Amino acid sequence: MGRTAVVTGASSGIGKATAAALVTRGYRVIGTSRKPEGIEPDAQVPGVEYRALDLTDNASIAAFVAGLGEVDLLVNNAGESQAGPLAELPTDAVERLFRLNVLGPIALTQAVLPGMRERRYGRVVMVGSMIASFPMPYRSSYGATKAALKGFAVAARFEESPFGVWLTTVEPGQINTGLRERRTKYLDEGSPHTADFTRFIAKLDEAQGKGITADKVADTIVRAIEADRPQPLYAVGSNAPIMFGVRRLLPRTVLERLIARVHGLSR
């Protein structure tokens, strides 16, 4: 196809699966990792050009962008998962989460948009989460970052689509990529939320262990990229069509009780 794609967080999970899918379809793929030299040879995707990028570091973003050249597709996938009661989340941890999950991807998007407009073609995919559409307890900071990404993408579609540049969001539901092992958790010693939080995390881990594969999400990302007019939102996994239908039909208070019950919480 001759098009160049950038996939952030390409060393594992959704990013790795997306990079592999795009290489198979003939794209030139630049995959990012904070430490690409640490990716074992047998964990690398053949055909992917790995480059260093730390989305929390403005200097790293600037250095990465300076060496890019033309980019036709950007998949903003890199991010961190975080959990904890709002009252006990360290401010510096929340700030870092927003730098990694929101501000870094937006800076990268701003860097590639002018070239896409000039060539009258571009695709930007924000890898979000269904938690942005269905907020969960103890996931306020993470859900807020994913809602912010979607908000940027939905609004910017109006600005960029006249130039042939389409922004879209892919929202996976529960996905089994090992992210639960890397999730950062914050809970004060003696917290009044301890029992509630412990039950919630156990239910969440169980659901994610039964979740869809990264390949399933990658297939949806590729479908969005290759659509003539990508939709604003693609949701995949966790019975997405049913869940979004239920959200339209049920009052918010009923939906809150349903989410609480599914995660072992009494409300």
Predicted region positions:
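Active-site-adjacent segment of SDR/Rossmann-fold oxidoreductases
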Residues: F134, A155-W166
